[in-house]
Amino acid sequence: LAPELLAESPARQDSIEISGGTDGEGVALTVPDLAPDGLGVTFGISFTVDYATESDSVDSGLTVLTTTSDDVSAYVQPMATGVRVLTAIASAEAPGDYTYTFDVPEGTSLVEGVGRYYLSDDDRVLGALLPPWAVDAAGESVPTSYSWADGKLTQHVDLSSPRISFPVLADPAWGYAVEYKLTKTVAANKALLKKCFKCYFPVPGAPKAFPKVGQLLPLMVGPANFNCTFKNEFNATNWFAFQFDATKAHVDKLGSNIVFEFRALSNGTRYLMVSAYVVNDAFWLKNPAYQAGTYVNWKNFASNLNKA
């Protein structure tokens, strides 16, 4: 298994509940709520790895799952912001589809966001999925995609190319998404941020002018380095978003990112959705003050806009 992925696994294995694997029903995973009470709306969630048959062992911080195919192994990796299921595919004869059944309300849909997919039941977001990826043993990308139907997420991996070097590693990763209610329209919130970004974004080092693509943001929280680069802003009808990417000096480490999305639902609900992918789980897990402070910051961000 890829060593760089093992480095992202936190020491805690009890953050994810693993059960089942009997009577051909798959192995169930339960991800707890992440945000402390009053600091944002998150939803714990349960889903089943349908192609897994049992939880076999723990190796290098990963729970090993046996599967219905001799050519496929699965590994559960707890993350500070959720969980990922790594699927190791040994040959072209292995299945190309890997399905996960989510315990979500009827009518839940998969909605594409900025570098994320969200599970939404119209009036709330239940969590975030990172885009699917698959790489072969040579480090080359393998075509992969998601589909969603009736509570089932399927990752499709195209194993047809003769140039693929096996094994292939594929991954759907579940991360945190925290929701905060807003009182103003998407356009009004965007206008406020464009007029004075640091007036509302509650992190020291934020610039007065709305950031430009590639701009370094020297953000600091106490003594901790939160330096980011501004990746881009994204716009659509009733929707506005922007993304920060962590620099090498950031405590979350290079490769981490965070997305802020302003959305208006068909029922009139307006909200700020903050979703993150954190590489440096060790810092997150060893610093509960950082965890709580993160949610306080984003709660204050929404509050500042609501009070304007």
Model-based region annotation:
Residues G61-T63, T81-R84, A209-L219, T237-A246:
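Short, hydrophobic/aromatic-rich segments at coil-to-beta transitions
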Residues S91, F102-V104, L159, W174, ...:
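A mature extracytoplasmic/lumenal domain signature
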Residues G96, A191-K195, K299, S303:
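Solvent-exposed, polar/charged alpha-helical surfaces in well-ordered, non-transmembrane soluble domains
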Residues P162, K248-Y295:
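Beta-strand/loop substructures that line and gate deep hydrophobic ligand-binding cavities in soluble
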